[in-house]
Amino acid sequence: MTSRASSTTAAPLPENMAKPRTVLVLGANGFLGRHIVSALMAQGHSVIAGVRKLPASSHPDITYIETDFTKGLAPQDWLPVLEGVDVVINAVGLLREHDGQTFDTLHEQAPAALFRACQQSQVGLVIQISALGADEAAASAYHLSKKAADDVLRTLDIPAFILQPSLVFGPDGSSARLFTMLASMPVLPLPGGGCQLLQPVHIHDLTALVQALTPLNPAGTITIAVAGPQALTLREYTDLLRRQMGLGPLRAFSLHRILAKLAAQAGQWMSSSLLTPETLAMLERSNTADIEDMRFFLGRDPTPVASFINPAEADGWRALALLGWLQPLLRFSIAVVWIVTGLVSLGLYPVEESYALLAEVGLEGTAASVALYGAALLDIGFGIATLWLRKRRLLWQMQIAVILGYTLILSWFIPAFWLHPFGPLLKNLPMVALIYLLMTLERQHGLSRR
């Protein structure tokens, strides 16, 4: 929904003031912040990028400063940062609480302190990036915390825009990666059949809106819903993304809500999962908005979902989307091979025959037992580590080394295995290739997260 302050008109700056401004963008290293910074730079503004940790390499035309929202909880903490700043844009946000970062601190306390400091410093304009759904009907901790900061800003005597974006689609956005990945799956289970309503907006429309608002001087606070031109069901959204990636129509089935809730509970324990009980509840809310105000300030209609993916970029989107679920599937498969191999060696396969094979490579007695059970435990350890380790480069290297070691030993002592109809040695070749592929993908595309 869209709400406005008592004054609903935005007056442009006088002609002699319509010039580049000094803009502080907080959360500048996040998805929204990065794109906002680029858009403002293209417009000729002087940008100060507020980041939690200074980057190792920086843009020569951007001033970087450390701004930690977990510590800036009082207005006086922000006053030095605001010296010489004309516009403040708060793009800090998180979808899940983690590592000491909470909704209460990052979405409510720190922004409230920042906004009060902006009033004291007489900052010319504040743009708060909130969220669609941060309204009177808000129920989730995420939306309630966003609404609390918005409400503080509305009480202050300072020109401000509160932007409430819907689901934002962009090439490096986590939600875009998630939904394109889901859309690329051969068959997609959708909670309740995917009837939930979404109104996704493209990142380029959000940044274009910020560009249009930055030179303005509104009287009071104006709240603008930022969404796409039409509401779509979850099923329609994923189907459109799939077709734009050149994968044909979506094949989906209805996932019972009980199973969806169980999956969300499981996702709660996975640090990188976007599916949690709270995000599932937010999805079920079916959040949509009237975008009349957005059209007014943007001067055009926002981009429809059917045009989100540039045809020239469809191949790249498709490859990354497929890797999104194929990579963890490959990793799970390799983990199963290691674990099952270890369990087989522990006794599922006749121990006497295992000892007979070890005798062929010159191991008998105690040495054979140590080799058999030691290798079995190593295999199981490899499998568990494959599933749970976050940084796996060394693990992949160790696995390749062990497989090559097994292969060389057996090739020397039992070369007939190369001609065995079940291919016990030949199968090592694709195994090594897959492990190397995963190691390369994780290094080049950052796919190492669980």
Label each residue range with its predicted role.
Residues 22-43:
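N-terminal Rossmann NAD(P)H-binding glycine-rich loop of SDR-like oxidoreductase domains
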Residues 276-349, 366-450:
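Extended, low-polarity transmembrane helix blocks
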Residues 113, 174-175, 193-215, 222-225:
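Substrate-positioning beta->alpha
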Residues 348-366:
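Membrane-interface interhelical connector segments
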Residues 56, 62-113, 117, 132-136:
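NAD(P)H-binding glycine-rich loop region in Rossmannoid oxidoreductase-like domains
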Residues 13-14, 213-275, 289-327:
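Mid/C-terminal beta-alpha module of Rossmann-like enzyme folds, strongest
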